[in-house]
A protein has these predicted regions:
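Short hydrophobic-aromatic micro-motifs
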Residues: 66-67, 163, 214-216
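A structural signal for short, well-ordered beta-strand segments
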Residues: 126-128, 163-165, 238-242
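Conserved metal-binding segment of the jelly-roll/cupin
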Residues: 208-223
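Catalytic core of non-heme Fe(II) oxygenases with the double-stranded beta-helix
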Residues: 138-207, 248-255
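Non-heme Fe(II)/2-oxoglutarate
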Residues: 3-22, 27-33, 220-221, 225-297
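Non-heme Fe(II)-dependent double-stranded beta-helix
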Residues: 2-152
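Active-site rim elements
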Residues: 99-100, 200-204, 224-226
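Short, solvent-exposed loop/turn segments at secondary-structure junctions
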Residues: 71-73, 129-134, 148, 170-172, ...
Length: 297
């Protein structure tokens, strides 16, 4: 069991994953380093061949997009290994957000975010990481919408966007994402409020591998499936939510894409996620106890 004192000690986390940095410092490289990796610095190059016009057409029609082979494999492999180390240590995968590299993944996606949200981008304090293990009946989150309010104005002005990044292969066998495309739901008599409202033939599976980036309007109905015990590997993934900062804040505090939170701020934010998402994710009493202790100061 991890103590509150350990949780508050950045060196404890650096020791668990010495190849990753916290606020520019890692256990394997104690000197302060530049927190911007090559992936973040070369963000524009990641989308050099992306057809943003076709991407927009699909997004505004169906409510989501899926791009393959965008993010650098080396960065994703290090994050996947770090989450596997957290799991092996009996710690939740969401603790990966203590490390700089988890934030750098999304910083590298600025050109994509700018295309949909404009230049004024804010990170919402809503994020999670999954390790869907087929050995214990693991599953993604049940059907839901990330935000129940207005996610866009008309068909050309987006208010908020969710991004989802697989660190491993995400397949129908190990729990890939599923969506109800808006192009189908808009013909329903009323918006879907429960899974039974969905016409099964309208459901779309979205298998994806490391390097892919998936995004959807926050009012898109979506879920992660349950893994088969015959799946060969777990589904490991990250998500983070964003908004156009020109609109009223959809969360508090709004975060800066270019300046990740400090270690103490990250710890508080992560503890808040466990409280926020306890209705979506099974959590043990020990995890909730140290989260509540951190939130109380």
């Amino acid at each position: 069991m991890m103590t509150v004192e350990q949780a508050k000690n950045a060196d404890f986390w650096r020791g668990l994953n010495p190849g990753l940095q916290i606020c520019g410092v890692s256990a394997s490289s104690p000197q302060l380093a530049d927190a911007n990796t090559d992936a973040a610095n070369a963000a524009t190059d990641l989308f050099a061949t992306t057809d943003f016009s076709a991407l927009s057409d699909r997004f505004w029609d169906e409510g989501y997009f899926l791009l393959h082979d965008i993010l650098p494999a080396e960065l994703l492999a290090r994050l996947r290994a770090a989450i596997e180390q957290l799991i092996a240590s009996g710690l939740p995968p969401a603790m990966i957000y203590l490390y700089d590299e988890a934030w750098q993944v999304f910083s590298a996606l600025r050109p994509l975010l700018t295309h949909f949200l404009g230049e004024k981008i804010a990170l919402l304090p809503h994020f999670w990481a999954w390790h869907v293990d087929p050995r214990d009946g693991g599953r993604g989150w049940p059907p839901h919408r990330d935000y129940q309010g207005e996610s866009a104005i008309g068909d050309d002005m987006l208010i908020s966007l969710s991004l989802w990044v697989p660190l491993s292969d995400a397949t129908p066998e190990n729990g890939c994402m599923y969506v109800l495309p808006r192009s189908f739901e808009r013909w329903y008599d009323s918006p879907v409020t429960k899974p039974q409202d969905v016409v099964l033939q309208d459901v779309r599976a979205l298998p994806a591998g490391p390097g892919a980036v998936m995004g959807w309007r926050q009012d898109v109905y979506h879920w992660g499936s349950r893994a088969s015990r015959h799946a060969s590997s777990p589904r490991i993934s990250l998500s983070l939510e964003f908004q156009n900062a020109a609109f009223d804040p959809l969360g508090d505090p709004l975060l800066d894409l270019e300046t990740p939170p400090s270690f103490d701020e990250r710890l508080l934010l992560i503890a808040g996620q466990f409280e926020k998402y306890r209705h979506m994710q099974n959590m043990d009493d020990e995890t909730l106890a140290w989260c509540q202790a951190i939130l109380k100061g």
